[in-house]
Amino acid sequence: MATLQGTPVLILKEGTQRTVGRDAQRMNIMAARVIAEAVKSTLGPKGMDKMLVDSLGDVVITNDGVTILKEMDVEHPAAKMIIEVAKTQDNEVGDGTTTAVVLAGELLKKAEELLDQDIHPTVIARGYRMAANKAVEILESIAMDIDVEDEETLKKIAATAITGKHSEYALDHLSSLVVEAVKRVAEKVDDRYKVDEDNIKLEKRQGGSVADTKLVNGIVIDKEVVHPGMPKRVKNAKIAVLKAALEVKETETDAEIRITDPDQLMKFIEQEEKMLKEMVDRLAEAGANVVFCQKGIDDLAQYYLAKAGILAVRRVKQSDIEKIAKACGAKIITDLREITSADLGEAELVEERKVGDEKMVFIEGCKNPKAVTILIRGGSEHVVDEVERSLQDAIKVVKTALESGKVVAGGGAPEIEVALKIRDWAPTLGGREQLAAEAFASALEVIPRALAENSGLDPIDILVELRKAHEEGKTTYGVDVFSGEVACMKERGVLEPLKVKTQAITSATEVAIMILRIDDVIAAKGLEKEKGPEGESGGEEDSEE
């Protein structure tokens, strides 16, 4: 509402809420901090889990930051911005989602203290941006080069990502599987590795224990052989991968066939049978003894395939069809008339097996597979789901380390080192940006503090010890949450890719600056509020005011 020469002018729609100035900033900062506090207790190997129950009663138990935030039904726009940070971190590097969110929350908390001292948000934003650039510079200077051929180092990186997610008793086994899987699908381009993590399929099946999880040098698909008369096990498989259906095509035009005597009907049926038999004969002539089809397989075609001793699977997902082709070296066939033996892929064994209560088809022993499968096992559905999430993180982290070749120590060591260096550098800025840079340094210390708190250690004692160690030049010293002491994280094998840290700091800083610069929130009246519980208009409520 505004007034012009005493006349009230209605600018915004009735029911629109507007929050201006310091109130808007405080409200946004509070919303972001609430989200950060929600996941703070999950940080690190000793972090707690969250149980999330959705509106349908489905339960998710996890301490994976991005999963928690995705499952939360958040309404506040500033809180949604913080959740976007976690999603970006997850998509880019796979790990460090909780770190990014907690850091964003702490940066906003420190910014609020500066706002109380009448420091302008633009000055704080400028100081934060300069400090973030300096932080990335410092991280790059303390990063360690790794030999990408050194599997032990890669296993340590994978183990750091997996630790704390229901997988500790099979940690060595799982980290070995991850490294082997990533190296199988990695391609060398000009002395650098390129990894497409989509070529690593994670197939989960409840039953057994986490230690029963295994890597298959090929593909496992959640399907069964289509006909009981077909072989269930084929050695030295020649695999045809089809996008076309093994069915008689229906014409696109509406045609009507008038049949006047039984012979014509028999000819019609015989022609259909002949067409299906020709399709199967073409596959057999090309030398195929295994067929994976993206579309349907006619019942009669199934019979002919079984008669020819060919194992067939139908209605395979397109993503699986592509992975099968990559794993066994087959060409995807769209027209059966052009199939040749050169189009077929090869595998040592294709077999239908019962895993748990259901049947699955295994394609194993591919010579040079460019797609592999990790079959995840576990005692309960929640354990299997959490192991799947931890393996997804580990795969992305190992991929990032392979591609960049640089790592930093874990356990809060890089954050303490960066905080120390930024405090030394801040006085060179002059002006009020110096205060923002110092606040940035203090905010970084929330990571080692949270690691200590979540492990039941005294955060003040740990921080004092860490600062002392880093003052003495011990740049890799961090919190060992298992022994409860400050130690060299490099020696303890706690390593993370450099990109995980740089991405977390830049993402957290960007979102903190964006939220800080908002001084006016104009919220339109939501549809839910306009309608009553029966879908009636909320007019009565408006008239009462």
UniProtKB/Swiss-Prot annotation:
Keywords: ATP-binding, Chaperone, Nucleotide-binding
InterPro entries xrefs: Chaperone_TCP-1, Chaperonin_TCP-1_CS, Cpn60/GroEL/TCP-1, GroEL-like_apical_dom_sf, GROEL-like_equatorial_sf, TCP-1-like_intermed_sf, TCP-1_chaperonin, thermosome_alpha
GO molecular function per UniProt: ATP binding; ATP hydrolysis activity; ATP-dependent protein folding chaperone; unfolded protein binding
UniProt superkingdom: Archaea
Stored Gene3D superfamilies: GroEL, GroEL-like equatorial domain, TCP-1-like chaperonin intermediate domain
Residues spanning the membrane: none
A Pfam family recorded for this sequence: Cpn60_TCP1
Oligomeric and partner information: Forms a Heterooligomeric complex of two stacked eight-membered rings.
Function: Molecular chaperone; binds unfolded polypeptides in vitro, and has a weak ATPase activity.
NCBIfam families: thermosome_alpha, thermosome_arch, thermosome_beta
Family in the record: Belongs to the TCP-1 chaperonin family.
Protein name from the UniProt record: Thermosome subunit alpha
Taxonomic lineage from the root: Archaea, Methanobacteriati, Methanobacteriota, Archaeoglobi, Archaeoglobales
